[in-house]
Amino acid sequence: MAKRDYYEVLGVSRTASADELKKAYRTKAKELHPDRNADNPQAEAQFKEVNEAYDVLRDADKKAAYDRYGHAAFEGGMGGGARAGGYGQQGDFASAFSDVFEDLFGDFMGGRGGAPRSRAQRGSDLRYNLRVTLDEAYRGVQKTINVPASVACDACKGTGAEGGAEAVTCPTCSGMGKVRAQQGFFTVERTCPTCNGMGQIVKNPCKVCHGAGRVEKERSLSVNIPAGVETGTRIRLAGEGEAGMRGGPSGDLYIFIEVREHALFQRDGVHLFCRVPVSIAAAALGGEVEVPTIDGGSSRVKIPAGSQTGKQMRLRGKGMPALRGGGAGDMLIELAVETPVNLTARQKELLREFEKLSEDNNPEGKSFFSKVKGFWDGMTG
């Protein structure tokens, strides 16, 4: 099968600069790298094609020969020089591309060379979901929680070695935590299978933790929940996560708060909302109603005469405290005018009489039916 044009392979024009060629190569190489395309059998061939194209175009002499003769410049019979130091030498190839691979795959492959890895590793962070009541969120509370986690092994003091002895340098990777393997035309670095990337091994593993340096245990912790927390509030306990590996520092524990729903109050940030039922008489004539407050007390609220369902009144400072200070929110009271049920005959009689006398006392009703009449007149007119 005929080879594709090298410029087409890299997706650049024939006038591309050296920097543009390098940038295009890095993009293509990263996209087609075999380790990133395990499920694509064509990726390796395409990756080699990209490497071959860049190997030619990055070299001024080979690029000049390719621009003049095309692929024929590297197929023999074109005189000396064109193939010198060319694509076929794996050692030279890997060396020539080391700067690109180092920059492109440094994080992906763990980097080349460098100092031996430290055996100590920080422990993982942990998450704990804690539910509190709205009353507890209002006042603040001290909670005791039980956290299952990995903790430092007491028998080996977290070293993983019997009697607390020191670990030794891994003979496979010489303490690097990585080993090199030839893959195609370049060298790939992978995690050392002997020490699992630790760089050191334990000759005589601790019989309690089997060399891990930590054991599973449930711990009881006291957590201070400040007043004003809400669902989603995160509390960090430094150093209370999983123990580090072989003497490394512990991770952190993050407490995520969930505030339970309340029977009377709904919450919106620092504000509280309470729906209060009132009788028809109280709504029509006005009066007072006693409402509970989150602090355990109550407040008497005046109901204006002629109040309707949905009317809101505000009790300032009776909401939730702000988490980081700054006072408290408000409590909003919404009236719900309650229609009486299970009426006696006398009550029904009085209501019918009241209805006859109240034609001019229902402005919203009159306005609504006036609009309905206008609507139907417009339909029939």
Curated annotation (Swiss-Prot):
It comes from Cereibacter sphaeroides (strain KD131 / KCTC 12085). The gene is dnaJ. Gene3D superfamilies: DnaJ domain (1.10.287.110), Heat shock protein DnaJ, cysteine-rich domain (2.10.230.10), Urease metallochaperone UreE, N-terminal domain (2.60.260.20). GO terms for cellular component: cytoplasm. Keywords: Chaperone, Cytoplasm, DNA replication, Metal-binding, Repeat, Stress response, Zinc, Zinc-finger. The J domain is necessary and sufficient to stimulate DnaK ATPase activity. Zinc center 1 plays an important role in the autonomous, DnaK-independent chaperone activity of DnaJ. Zinc center 2 is essential for interaction with DnaK and for DnaJ activity. This is Chaperone protein DnaJ. Binds 2 Zn(2+) ions per monomer. CXXCXGXG motif repeats lie at residues 153-160, 170-177, 192-199, 206-213. Zn(2+) 1 binds at C153, C156, C206, C209. It comes from the Bacteria.
